[in-house]
Amino acid sequence: MHDNLCLCLHCIRSDRDPEPKAHRELFLPPGELEALFASLRDEGYRFALPGESEAGDGPVCCVTFDDGYCNTRHFLETAEKFGIPFILFLNSYNVAHQVPFIWDIWEATRREPWPVSSVSYRRLYESLTPDEKTLLATDTHRPFAPEELEAFAAHPLVHLAPHGHTHQPLVGRYLEKAGIELDENLTFLERYERVLREDFSLPCGLYTRRLTRSLLARFKRIYTIDGGGFSPKDRVIHRISLVHPDYGGPLREQIRNSFGVKSRLMRKAQNLRYSNRLLSRLSLFGTAP
């Protein structure tokens, strides 16, 4: 077991932001994060990017964000306080088209569970009504505006990296579209500095052996959300996805639990469920993650 940690965060909600209308569990309080990083620092962890984790002594904690919510900018104060370089794995479609994330729109407007991997994200975006596109256009749910992202990406602690253009999980029938998703995403990122073009975060954390082989032929590191630690030489980095303490318990406890056999097995079962074409269709009648 490796002591190095790679954390996956999605949203940060300041007291000034409106209440979330979807996926409340993803919104982390800044104060809880500051307490977590102070605790990790006191335990001897140093903060670094995964690609720089071999340098220096002691265990490493790496911090990543997925998707591109504009509220990611709230993390800069914490990052500066603790000297934390971090990665934002960005979905470019939402910034380019200025539309909130489809899974939030779905949860806010429909009763059916979010289908995760059995639908075309691009087609869903194209089918949105004007009202659906603006329903969640608040500082809580919206993506970065282009000018905001440009300013954010210029910060020396910020590094952008690809996460797919529309966030389409690259499994089942959508594996054949992987090249298009990646090319559009990387082309969009060319305009920014400090882009980690050799790092890729799997949309929804879903993967198969075939996809893994294909991605490792193109990227140096790919990132899951399977939990546990990592070694600096790992090319598949299993991140720990943190949720609001009201849903998952204290953040430090969530990290410890991610190393447990039960947690890892549950994540593998979930990955199998949504990566398999037949099972992903059946998942429409279950509970989406």
Regions found by a protein language model. Name each.
Residues 73-74, 148, 211:
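Short acidic active-site motifs
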Residues 32, 51-53, 57-62, 69-76, ...:
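A structural preference for long, well-packed, hydrophobic secondary-structure segments
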